Structures are given as C-alpha cells and as structure tokens.
Amino acid sequence: MPIFRKDEMEATPDVARPHIKMIQYAGHLHKVGIVTYKKGDVPPPHYHTNDEQWIYILSGKLAVLLGDETTTADAGDLIFIPRNTVHGIRLLDDECTFFACKNKSGAGGLSEDYTDVTNLDELIEKLEMQE
C-alpha cells in the first residue's frame, strides 16, 4: 500500500502553467495534488468536460466562481465542482494552498481536461466583485 510521505514528495511543473509547481499523483481512477497559488498565478475560469473535481482548502481565503454564482471560501472548506461546470478562483490572501482530487483523464496531470471559456472577461469581472 503506497504511502506518500510529505518530506519525500516533490513538486513538479504544472502541464498548463509550467512556472507553477504542484505535488501531483495519479492512481487508476483518480488524480490528486497539493497546489499552492500566489496572487496573480491562478488559472483563468475554465471547465472540465471529463473531470469532476473536489478542492479542500488547507490555507488562505479565495473568491470562488461556480457556474453563475460567486462566493468566498477559506481554510477548512470543501468545494465540489461537477464536470462541465465553469469555475475559477481569485485569491483574497497573498497565497492559498489546497488539496485537489479529480477523476483521472489523460496522463494524470491535474491540469489535463482543461477547457477555456468564451466569456473570460465577464467571468473575471464577476470574481473581482466578490469580497
């Protein structure tokens, strides 16, 4: 039974944004990772056609876009994102770390199955208004 020890885990560059490093692993059915974002490094709003996603916030506070709604979430909150649901985040603190879990698609990287949205500016504006 594999146990991944925190002092043995190595962060690797994200597939979609190589300047961001993530600790990520893939099993047979799921892929998981520990992700830390700093202000300005978050991905733009997007959706996944094949992946459901869970995010458990370990530290930090953020504005969250889920579909047509925005809200805030902070350490201890668990977010579920159904597949095909447009979602995005904006950091309200300087840094945010979370544990992410998705069903596996592709080679197992967390950023695979990443689909851009056509109304990006509108969604970013919506996130900017959330306090």
Language-model regions, residue ranges each:
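A short glycine-rich, His/Asp/Glu-containing loop-to-beta-strand
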Residues: 10-45
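Short acidic-glycine-tyrosine-enriched beta hairpin
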Residues: 68-83
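Short, conserved beta-strand element in jelly-roll/cupin
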Residues: 36-38, 47-64
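Short, charged/polar surface micro-motifs in flexible loops or helix N-caps
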Residues: 28-30, 38-41, 61-62, 70, ...
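Short beta-strand His + acidic residue motifs that chelate non-heme Fe in jelly-roll/DSBH
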Residues: 45, 64-65, 81, 87-93, ...
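Double-stranded beta-helix
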Residues: 3-5, 9, 29-31, 88-131
